[in-house]
């Protein structure tokens, strides 16, 4: 087509059918179809499993038709299975030491047991509970023999209790002993050769030792 004919066709002076410019030759040609995104990303089912037959399952111990799957299941036991050794309870310390439980009155009051330790000045202590002033003589005899004496005057009336206290105080002074108050209406007479500390007197009062005698 000549240039003049192209100009005429452009301005409508010539029929468009005669205009066969190369730019319009492929207008009616169908565009190539692009494959969907899914088709490009994921292969077809047939293509994906086409070569599955090439991979066999001839591993030793595999049983294709059996219900259990593997014949030698013992080979696959976990190495980290819990051990039965940890289920056993730890032995009690008391059974290892082999010590028998303490029985008797000492087991009921440990503070009293400390007073009775061998070598303690209170190991031979005695407790007297006079009912009236006439029993003061027994207190004097025990104290004179070198025995520490606890006087429990709780059951006495105040008048007789005061007389016994005066007697015991004079006795302790005469024999160079000591006379101490342990609790209300409870007193301790100690010979000269026995020194009872304030801590020991406190322990006697706290433990109620005199009430066990």
From Swiss-Prot:
A GO cellular component annotation in the UniProt record: cytoplasm
GO biological process: division septum assembly; FtsZ-dependent cytokinesis
Keywords assigned by UniProt, alphabetized: Cell cycle, Cell division, Cytoplasm, Septation
Comp. bias intervals (Basic and acidic residues): 35-51, 72-90
Localization annotation: Cytoplasm
InterPro entries, sorted: Cell_div_SepF, Cell_div_SepF/SepF-rel, SepF-like_sf
Region of interest (Disordered), ranges: 27-103
Pfam families: SepF
Assembly, per entry: Homodimer. Interacts with FtsZ.
Free-text function comment from the UniProt entry: Cell division protein that is part of the divisome complex and is recruited early to the Z-ring. Probably stimulates Z-ring formation, perhaps through the cross-linking of FtsZ protofilaments. Its function overlaps with FtsA.
Assigned protein family: Belongs to the SepF family.
PANTHER family the UniProt entry points to: CELL DIVISION PROTEIN SEPF (PTHR35798:SF1)
The protein's name: Cell division protein SepF
Gene name linked to the record: sepF
